[in-house]
From Swiss-Prot:
Name recorded for this polypeptide: Mevalonate kinase
GO annotation, biological process: isopentenyl diphosphate biosynthetic process, mevalonate pathway; sterol biosynthetic process
Regulation: Its activity is inhibited in vitro by geranyl pyrophosphate (GPP) and farnesyl pyrophosphate (FPP) that bind competitively at the ATP-binding site on the enzyme.
GO cellular component, one term: cytosol
Entry EC number(s): 2.7.1.36
Catalytic site: D204 (proton acceptor)
Signal peptide: none
Cofactor: Mg(2+)
Higher taxonomy: Eukaryota, Viridiplantae, Streptophyta, Embryophyta, Tracheophyta
Family note: Belongs to the GHMP kinase family. Mevalonate kinase subfamily.
The species this protein was found in: Arabidopsis thaliana (Mouse-ear cress)
């Protein structure tokens, strides 16, 4: 049997950094996906006593005997309950880390270890100790702020949960899960994100699982329904950033200049709320007029992010290039590098701006904003 699943990446449309200080932020799914294929061998097949993980886009393969996994991971039949998502204990995580170490990851790929640990945890908790080959490939650049780890957790969990769906209820082509299974999927994916990030907000996995857009403030997540098409150019600066240091820097600036930074955060809050209202609006306002308002909000948001100290010369280079083509851009996520969003109004031809950006060493993607969440296929 073969099961496929896919889950989208995400962008922060407005509110990054300020959300840590009580402001509203808006995030959206993008139509760049992580794909997971789950293949179960026939009982008579060779290697029906192994669990194999293939990372296609980085040409790596890992394989464990089921006997070794059972030996390493404490097994209690009562903990295997796909309908009750559970956290990975420190003890179990240490045991899983040993399994990962035994695979002799290349030094330059050690950043993959937490993702592989997450794979082993989710697989054994949801499926148990059954043989399979799991193939993962992704359209999302790793570590660029587009939610690649959450998309992995969501797509993997979707495939694992889908493997036990009755054949009678299976559809043809890509199909979404029902609300009950989506909620279960999102909870399991969040447990996976905790292994990778420690204390994630839950935003990335929620956007990836449900798709479309969400608004979040003070820990509360509200799903939004977009009523207008949005297309963005996403430019990866290829500059790595230290998210923790950037967040800390904004907090320190807020301590030094409390009144000024409070005004900045309040302004960002207003921008996020207005953006959410425009996107959800069902009034007769033309798409062109809405796009103009969104352009202005993005421009203001970028100015406020600059005042927080989280921009970077690479981000400013992208912005200057897109301005020459009469396009508006803002950083997305932590800043300090990472990715930049450029709004593409209806009818925009991007060939020339993409050519100019790529000639400067940047990586470009065009993406539709607010699309489908996790989907499965048989």
């Amino acid at each position: 049997m073969e099961v496929k699943a896919r889950a989208p990446g995400k962008i922060i449309l407005a509110g990054e950094h300020a959300v840590v200080h009580g402001s509203t932020a808006v995030a959206a799914a993008i139509d760049l996906y992580t794909y997971v294929t789950l293949r179960f061998p026939l009982p008579s097949a060779e290697n029906n006593d192994r669990l194999t993980l293939q990372l296609k886009d980085i040409s790596l393969e890992f394989s464990w005997s089921l006997a070794r996994i059972k030996e390493a991971i404490p097994y209690d039949s009562s903990t295997l309950c796909r309908s009750t998502p559970a956290s990975c204990s420190e003890e179990t995580l240490k045991s899983i880390a040993v399994l990962v170490e035994e695979q002799n990851l290349p030094k330059e790929k050690m950043w993959l270890s937490s993702g592989i640990s997450t794979f082993l945890w989710l697989y054994t908790r949801i499926i148990g100790f059954n043989p399979a080959t799991v193939v993962i490939n992704s359209e999302l650049p790793y570590g660029s702020g587009l939610g690649s780890s959450a998309a992995l957790c969501v797509a993997l969990t979707a495939a694992l949960l889908a493997s036990s769906i009755s054949e009678k209820t299976r559809g043809n082509g890509w199909s979404s899960l029902d609300e009950t299974n989506l909620e279960l999927l999102n909870k399991w994916a969040f447990e996976g994100e905790k292994i990778i990030h420690g204390k994630p907000s839950g935003i990335d996995n929620t956007v990836s699982a449900y798709g479309n857009m969400i608004k979040f403030c003070s820990g509360e997540i509200t799903r939004l329904q977009s009523n207008m098409p949005l297309r963005m150019l996403i430019t990866n600066t290829r500059v790595g950033r230290n998210t923790k240091a950037l967040v800390s820097g904004v907090s320190q600036r807020a301590v030094r200049h409390p009144d000024a930074m409070k005004s900045v955060f309040n302004a960002v809050d207003s921008i996020s709320k207005e953006l959410a209202a425009i996107i959800q609006s069902k009034d007769e306002t033309s798409v062109t007029e809405k796009e103009e308002r969104i352009k202005e909000l993005m421009e203001m948001n970028q100015g406020l992010l600059l005042s927080m100290g989280v921009s970077h010369s690479s981000i400013e280079a992208v912005i200057l290039t897109t301005v020459k083509h009469k396009l508006v851009s803002k950083l997305t996520g932590a800043g300090g590098g990472g990715c930049v969003l450029t709004l593409l109004p209806t009818g925009t031809v991007v060939d020339k701006v993409v050519e100019e950006l790529e000639s400067s060493g940047f990586q470009c993607f065009t993406a539709l904003i607010g699309g489908n969440g996790a989907q499965i296929c048989y």
